[in-house]
């Protein structure tokens, strides 16, 4: 999925989360 954060490494649920 497309990440809303800066990095697209980690996805949370149905949305892409930032690589924290």
Curated annotation (Swiss-Prot):
Top-level taxon in the UniProt lineage: Eukaryota
The keyword RNA-binding is annotated on this UniProt entry: no
Keywords assigned by UniProt, alphabetized: IgA-binding protein, Lectin, Mannose-binding
Entry keyword Amino-acid biosynthesis: no
Region listing for Disordered, in residue ranges: 1-20
Similarity-based family: Belongs to the jacalin lectin family.
Subunit comment: Tetramer of four alpha chains associated with two or four beta chains.
Protein name: Agglutinin beta-2 chain isoform 2
């Amino acid at each position: 999925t497309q990440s809303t954060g800066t990095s697209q490494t980690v996805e949370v649920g149905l949305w892409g989360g930032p690589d924290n």
